[in-house]
Swiss-Prot record:
Quaternary structure and interacting proteins, as annotated: Homodimer. Heterotetramer of two MnmE and two MnmG subunits.
Species for this entry: Azorhizobium caulinodans (strain ATCC 43989 / DSM 5975 / JCM 20966 / LMG 6465 / NBRC 14845 / NCIMB 13405 / ORS 571)
The EC number(s) this enzyme carries: 3.6.-.-
Binding residues annotated for (6S)-5-formyl-5,6,7,8-tetrahydrofolate, in chain numbering: R24, E82, K122, K435
HAMAP family in UniProt: GTPase_MnmE
Protein's name in the database: tRNA modification GTPase MnmE
Keyword Transport appears in the UniProt entry: no
Binding of GTP, residues: 229-234, 248-254, 273-276
Length: 435
């Protein structure tokens, strides 16, 4: 059972062995770790080089740096102490084993430092989600987007929207409370409606970009499709830079979906090799064809490969057409085709450039504000309530005010002011110990 009154500790840097290991302690007794192991606590935010010793015996554990960050001016909002050690496994184990013996100290649970930062008002829910995304970011676009989120880009936008919404609500409530007293202007709902309409426009713009944010966060899917023996697996291997797929002149060799992860245009991409699309009586191959169609339909971009100009299915949305085996056929291709030879590499750079261009159109530009389905749903709820408030006829200010209050509550859900515990539990399960 975890208690917020405990002082928690953990290795907060990367996996050992490493050049330097950082052990962090946070909680009401964090100072005592410095006194017990180093015999001192340095001034706030000042590093001191000290000998760390086992309390009682005086045995030397290591020599390193000690820093102290008193709450609330710390990452967690609590007193926090850091020990910067040599990154050997035995050194780290010895220090952790010593800390666990101190009264009131216990090992931190996964994500517990961040949970305390949230509880102490250092981070809101959107920022915690951004930090979770930053920890697992693989591509440059994911890093930039997660960093913007964890730095409060969405939180600041929501705070501004909420402030304006509360101002509009106050105007409507003033109309309700004081309209008969002559202390307020006759038409306060007009400015309130204007503000609500402006908010609707801004939320609509943010939501229109949500799909891009979620795509960048999750990574893009590019499916390689085409008839059997069109060179799909050969192209996959060429783009992956390794022999990821079996290549055979026998049509129907690829029967299942094969995935390779790579980066293009700063984006995380899953490249999917699919079974050749054709009619077949082979039950296993037929299942592969079915799966290929499903993956192609759910992908962000389809590369349609053919060595003879076979057209893609009419229900396939705007594929990038690629004429393969140029080294064998010598074909020049149609105007909308890119001609390549995956064997010799001819045309591959042109193909990659076009793939990167299309990925840039789908996921480029400044980081999106909305990056998760939960955020999108909450903002959609706020937009719905604002639209409902604007639809209210005059002289029904009570109902209009209620819709504005519900819109404010929906905005609160974005940053975790309400209904937050279940989301936090799910989030912190994805965090590492020490974060």
């Amino acid at each position: 059972m975890t208690r917020s009154s405990d002082t928690i500790f953990a290795l907060s840097s990367g996996r050992v062995p490493s050049g330097v290991a950082v052990v962090r302690a946070s909680g009401p007794r964090a100072r005592e770790a410095g006194l017990a192991l180093a015999g001192l606590v340095p001034p706030p935010r000042v590093a001191r080089y000290v000998a760390l010793r086992e309390p009682g015996t005086g045995d030397l554990l290591d020599r390193g740096l000690i820093l102290f960050f008193p709450g609330p001016r710390s990452a967690t909002g609590e007193d926090t102490l850091e020990l910067h050690l040599h990154g050997g496994p035995a050194v780290v184990t010895a220090v952790l084993r010593t800390l666990v013996k101190l009264p009131g100290f216990r090992p931190a649970a996964a994500g517990e430092f961040t949970r305390r930062a949230h509880a102490n008002g250092k981070m809101d829910l959107a920022e915690v989600e951004g930090l979770a995304d930053l920890i697992v970011a693989e591509s440059e676009a994911q890093r930039r987007q997660a960093l913007a989120q964890s730095s409060g880009a969405l939180s600041r936008a929501v705070a501004g929207w909420r402030e304006r919404l509360i101002r509009a609500l106050a105007l409507v409530e003033a109309t309700i409370d004081f309209s008969d007293e002559g202390d307020v202007p006759d038409d306060l709902t007009g400015p309130a409606r204007a503000e609500a309409a402006a908010l609707c426009t801004e939320l609509t713009t943010a939501l229109a970009d949500a799909d891009r944010g979620e795509r960048v966060r999750d990574g893009f899917i590019i499916a390689i499709a085409g008839p059997p023996n069109a060179g799909k697996s050969t192209l996959l291997n060429r783009l992956a830079g390794r022999e990821a797929a079996i290549v055979s002149p026998v049509p129907g060799t690829t029967r299942d979906v094969l995935e390779v992860h790579l980066h293009l245009a700063g984006q995380a991409v899953t490249l999917v090799d699919t079974a050749g699309l054709r009619e077949t009586d082979d039950l296993v191959e037929a299942e592969g064809v079915r799966r290929a169609r499903v993956r192609a339909e759910g992908s962000d971009l389809v590369l349609w490969l053919s060595d003879d100009g076979t057209a893609p299915p009419t229900d396939m949305p705007a594929p990038l057409r690629v004429r393969t085996k140029a080294d064998v056929t010598g074909a020049e291709g149609e105007e909308d085709e890119i001609v390549i030879s995956a064997q010799t590499g001819a045309g591959i750079n042109t193909l990659i450039a076009e793939m990167e261009r299309r990925l840039g159109e789908m996921g480029g530009g400044e980081p999106a504000l909305v990056t998760r389905e939960r955020q999108r749903h909450a903002l959609s709820d706020a937009l719905y309530e604002l639209d409902a408030a604007l639809a209210i006829q005059t002289h029904d200010e009570d109902l209009m005010a209620e819709h504005l209050r519900l819109a404010a509550r929906a905005l609160d859900q974005v940053v975790g002011r309400v209904d937050v515990e279940d989301v936090l539990e799910s989030l912190f399960r994805t965090f590492c110990i020490g974060k």
